[in-house]
Amino acid sequence: MKFFFIFFIFLFSFLIQSCYSDNTILRSQSLKDGDVIYSEGKRFAFGFFSLGNSKLRYVGIWYAQVSEQTIVWVANRDHPINDTSGLIKFSTRGNLCVYASGNGTEPIWSTDVIDMIQEPALVAKLSDLGNLVLLDPVTGKSFWESFNHPTNTLLPFMKFGFTRQSGVDRIMTSWRSPGDPGSGNITYRIERRGFPQMMMYKGLTLWWRTGSWTGQRWSGVPEMTNKFIFNISFVNNPDEVSITYGVLDASVTTRMVLNETGTLQRFRWNGRDKKWIGFWSAPEDKCDIYNHCGFNGYCDSTSTEKFECSCLPGYEPKTPRDWFLRDASDGCTRIKADSICNGKEGFAKLKRVKIPNTSAVNVDMNITLKECEQRCLKNCSCVAYASAYHESQDGAKGCLTWHGNMLDTRTYLSSGQDFYLRVDKSELARWNGNGASGKKRLVLILISLIAVVMLLLISFHCYLRKRRQRTQSNRLRKAPSSFAPSSFDLEDSFILEELEDKSRSRELPLFELSTIATATNNFAFQNKLGAGGFGPVYKGVLQNGMEIAVKRLSKSSGQGMEEFKNEVKLISKLQHRNLVRILGCCVEFEEKMLVYEYLPNKSLDYFIFHEEQRAELDWPKRMGIIRGIGRGILYLHQDSRLRIIHRDLKASNVLLDNEMIPKIADFGLARIFGGNQIEGSTNRVVGTYGYMSPEYAMDGQFSIKSDVYSFGVLILEIITGKRNSAFYEESLNLVKHIWDRWENGEAIEIIDKLMGEETYDEGEVMKCLHIGLLCVQENSSDRPDMSSVVFMLGHNAIDLPSPKHPAFTAGRRRNTKTGGSSDNWPSGETSSTINDVTLTDVQGR
């Protein structure tokens, strides 16, 4: 019996010493390497860890519910332990310490607070916020906490800044490298001097600053908001200057990291994809780099000029030669003027500005902006002023005045604040439009001009309305009875006018409805070539014997009107051998139609997805089709008068003439870009599953690389004779199937055998397959542009880069036996098809 009692006491003591499933370390306990304590909700863990393949051991805090190792705080960051003999325990004086071994007497890290021998109940507790706290569990009094000693990570509800009375200054310091948490040379802190702002340093060099606090946000962080994710609390009083970011939704896991390259980044954890997603970073551009344009200069990243730097009003380049060479580091100096401080100067108002460095400003929070102006005007050394809190809940308040050089000023398209710069009377006249009276005259002139223009527009509108009524009346009399209108949309009349203008300029012929009806035998069923979400397509024969294809907008189509207008605008301007040729259009009553050249061989999908027709396409024909499609896309992206992204490239939108020359068709979803624009975004994602690039399907981001992705899918379909949207063996789609075979060195096995092995060179086919995989890489920046693709297709003696992991965009489940498709769409999406066109309305998240 005595033996069992002793054994029970021993076991109980062992459990007390070794079991750390709770969130607390008692003063009598220790934590050895391998032991971990968790916060109450199991969100965070505290213990020993290593990074990557390193054997060095550190003590720190990390996310417990995140699959990717993410360290948020490191105790012994500059003193790692070489093996697993480390120990965490309380010292005799009550500090929590880390020892390199269980026998060590001198700690390598300590909380290093006041002597706490008189605190026998002291514990270390890990909270669900990720904060390790030394406290008295009875009174709740805190003696030390890790939140007051951040490393490279700022967590929600972590107070950041300084407290004068306690001497606590919370400073973030980067790691040395991703695999070394030692103290790096990048620091981030709240500036103690002048008016509060956040500063990032590279060593001793100021690298970036947030701008001053406006009452709602930092003036140099226009993306900052407290409405959706964060509840931001800013404190500025004689004892404390701090900021705290609280999350409004506890389910959102987010952190801000200062990395070793000098970038501050904010991440959120994507539980679905199991990875961190970055959604903000700074510095963002050249204008964010501290004092990029020198003293008294300002930076405008949206400037249409070649140089983003300019001098503030009333200033000129200090070294004109350097400015000509695009070097503004010497800054600007005031233009010599006689009227400064003689009562004849004033203030130029600069809007949407990140105001200059506030480290040396004079601050008075008890006067209005108008009083601030008068104070600055009376002080000859005052060069500028601004409101301290211009976005305060109580309205603009406080006064900031600058005396001397102004550093690190920039402008924004939106956000920023007003900044008032002292200038002499001549500069003020130029800035304000020849003075106040000149400004009033300018306003009167503008009002008069607007009134005249409005009168002309109203008169012109009345004229057009009468002309439309006459045109409508004439056409009603001529219309066949089978097309009598039930209504006439005002929008249709505007389209008709635009098309009539194109017809008169011979840019796009306009067909009469009666002509189209006769050519198609009143849209007889036997002349119907196909149908889609836009509406049916009919074959017709004009009186001169020319065969045509008529695309007729269905009255029930919910998507067709916008696509119809888009296609009319685009295709009438495009001319290329590999683009379908439009012959004209027709808009009468409720009828809207496009008239194309007739292509007897139908579309590409008719050949490559049907066994009998596929056998007609040997390798030379398939290679010719691939190259032709590539040249057509290159023309859209680069060589046409407009830069166009098709957005719906697929096999059914490639038509074949009698010589099997491919013609890209269906420009209803295309987008026109400016000459230098290469990407855009939309909330209305349209296209076809299986052909849509991942960044477009998931985020609405489209670019020339979106078409490259679709072209890559086409290449793979042409080579294999299989649809991308079908399931193959265990693969999600064709791209995944090909990638698996490519990785295993079995890609040659998926080439379509119906081509006939004698018609193709294995090396050439594999090169095309290689190019197809380069086009469907997941990251759009990794994909080649179309000029590179066309070059690679036309040259054999070149080395191709190895393709990276492709994107596997989910498509509809197909019946691989029949080639048909089921209705297994992702839930919550609505779709309609023009030969499988898919439209998805993406709601903001």
Swiss-Prot record:
Topology of the protein relative to the lipid bilayer: Single-pass type I membrane protein
Root EC class: transferase
Keyword Transmembrane helix among UniProt keywords: yes
Chain positions recorded as ATP binding sites: L529, G530, A531, G532, G533, F534, G535, P536, V537, K551
SMART domains on file: B_lectin, PAN_AP, S_TKc
Catalyzed reactions: L-seryl-[protein] + ATP = O-phospho-L-seryl-[protein] + ADP + H(+); L-threonyl-[protein] + ATP = O-phospho-L-threonyl-[protein] + ADP + H(+)
Region (Disordered), start-end ranges: 803-845
Keyword terms of this UniProt record: ATP-binding, Cell membrane, Disulfide bond, EGF-like domain, Glycoprotein, Kinase, Lectin, Membrane, Nucleotide-binding, Receptor, Serine/threonine-protein kinase, Signal, Transferase, Transmembrane, Transmembrane helix
Disulphide bonds in the chain: C287-C299, C293-C309, C372-C399, C376-C382
UniProt subcellular location: Cell membrane
Residue ranges occupied by any Protein kinase domain in the UniProt entry: 523-808
Residues that carry a glycan: N82, N103, N185, N231, N259, N357, N366, N379
GO molecular function: ATP binding; calmodulin binding; carbohydrate binding; protein serine kinase activity; protein serine/threonine kinase activity; ubiquitin protein ligase binding
Signal peptide annotation: 1-21
UniProt xrefs under InterPro entries: Bulb-type_lectin_dom, Bulb-type_lectin_dom_sf, EGF-like_dom, Kinase-like_dom_sf, Pan_app, Prot_kinase_dom, S_locus_glycoprot_dom, Ser-Thr/Tyr_kinase_cat_dom
Record EC number: 2.7.11.1
Superkingdom of the source species: Eukaryota
Annotated Pfam families: B_lectin (PF01453), PAN_2 (PF08276), PK_Tyr_Ser-Thr (PF07714), S_locus_glycop (PF00954)
Record-stated family: Belongs to the protein kinase superfamily. Ser/Thr protein kinase family.
Record-given protein name: G-type lectin S-receptor-like serine/threonine-protein kinase At1g11410
